[in-house]
């Protein structure tokens, strides 16, 4: 059968001599380029050169006979243009270089199968300007860029197979083929297949060679591209990928002058000839002016389908994207290819031809790949790691217009006369979900706001207001200090004025700054009380006392003795509010010190206030109320010494005032000591609920005692007495702690227990027993007894009984012997005259019983038949003579409600004989 080269779509009747002469020239020129790669250290270049020669010899194939299966998968085309994301209409893939022509009528020789490495790796450089252009893998181009070292675990031959292949030789002269030349050369020939062959511009490059776009495709012909690996590489190497494409689908130069070419962003500028007229040289006209009708449709390969699906999943939009150049923005609107992406974008462009640039963040949507493809892509990445690092290009695009117009950041595809720039998103943040979009939080205005400067400005405004107010001491009138008494009074008034001024400084600056810090969340609300406690309350107490002291000044001018002690007597209850401040002063200082160490912003603000506040820090102002309260008794003592001895009445009042103020101070100090002691007891007991149960308790006494258990054994422990509770704490081991807590209001009686233990006493109670331990919380018991053995038995019994009585009196549950005091509860004066004491008082219960008996008898008389009265009237029966208080035998009301009181007329119930011992145990009780 007659053979013909179907890749070119040329018949056998063509002028073959012309093509054969051109091919011979190309072969001769290719031999002259053998020295291009001699300096390359890769031994694989020699193998590749031999392989290329064998491939050129086997370019012909029999008509309608498919090529044999290649040994390795062919390299797919590097880029495709998509028409608005449509699947049916796909723009042609235009080859970047004219093929070498070899037409024979012989059968194909054995050898390596042809693939498209020659066409893909062809650099497309201008042949007119330079006959020996630099190759990308030649020493001239890769100067000071050695190949990566050979790994230890890999042999030298295996490793060099991974190196990039050398580019084929570029012919120095190729005859131009345009439409006119093709028509003239082909009109004279007669072809059995086609009388008017297509121009060379319609020739298409496939994985099996070059063929005509107008020819029908054989059923055995396959355009299946190999699978791509999911390996993500950095910015593509110009030796791997061709450069960007123009709007017509043909390759364009990336090294032209004028405008912002994508190649200007590259880190290197290789020396190569001008390529502006390359498309015109090959096709006979400018590729940018090539219309869509002149480009024949291309059969869609599998690789093209992958790109189409990928573009569809990335949601291609029809709106344009703004770029730095106005011309580029207009072309991008025409292209209408945008992708939703993350806000920050990288604009990258390669210096090679024929493909888009795939960056790190590009996604592989195929989902599966073969091991061979993985190894192939890994090899490419290893060999080109140096070039990838040097050839990375970034372009930081302004996204303000995108944010204002679309509120979305899209992938940017920009076309210019120099090429196409594709902007892909940056490297995504690693997430658990693959391909997840991570939203980057922008710093809010609250975080950028300078709070310290705002607070400082407010403090300066506060300072200006405070400076306009004069001090209190400067406003005081003249005080006569001719006598010692007047000098002491003057000192009291002046020191009180200074004390008030210092407290106002603390409130107007330190407390003001702390409240401002709470607004900006530098401090919390609870921190204010932890630092200042009830400082404002103490300030208002002094603010109330100061005008009272000023009223004493007119009397000093008359050399009279003012009753200044009455000011302190009148405000004695107010001074007790100092107790809560003094008791919390130590904890406030510790908390303030912790804030200054941990919170740097608060420390800087407080430090800024020291020059404004008379060079005193916050610690020195917070201790002034404690110092002032302790100074009041000392000033009153000096005042009593200054009084003359003849004025006995004023001496008595001043002494009473001094003792009262001293008692207030001692109570406050005692409260502080009491709080310290309670904290020590809580730490010593160390059970769960003990801190809650001892809250606001006053410590009275403690001692080492023994407790009698249920089985008769004894256990040692400590007995604590408080104003409302009794606590017995025992410690069995280091971690086994137990405490028994009994409320004084629930204790029925305290009695001796010497019939069994000579030094023992029992505490009986008829209510719930509160027991707390490290393992259990609370327990209940209907009736119980706590048997205590102590050498100081009488002392403990008296203390407990006195505390029980005082607690019941304060609680209003104490039961008096007679109830005639109830009528005087609401009276201010409870004194009785002699006549009242001599009058006869009848118990209220007895009167009530008598009234009930009279009512019953009256009801019986009304129901009864009238008969002569045999008995005396009821009124005569119950008439009682008046008795003196000395002769009255009224039974007192017992404090125990479960015991009945005998009536007056009834005989007293005989009590059973008591055993030999004095006290008996209740019938139902249990020991702890």
UniProtKB/Swiss-Prot annotation:
This is RhoGEF domain-containing protein gxcH. Transmembrane segments: none annotated. GO terms for cellular component: cytoplasm. Residues 30-48, 377-407, 848-857 have a biased composition (Low complexity). It comes from Dictyostelium discoideum (Social amoeba). The gene is gxcH. SUPFAM superfamilies: DBL homology domain (DH-domain) (SSF48065). Residues 112-123 have a biased composition (Acidic residues). Residues 699-807 are annotated as: PH-like. It holds the Pfam family RhoGEF. GO terms for molecular function: guanyl-nucleotide exchange factor activity. Residues 93-103, 129-141, 175-187, 334-367 have a biased composition (Polar residues). InterPro entries: DBL_dom_sf (IPR035899), DH_dom (IPR000219), FYVE_RhoGEF_PH (IPR051092). Residues 484-671 form the DH domain.
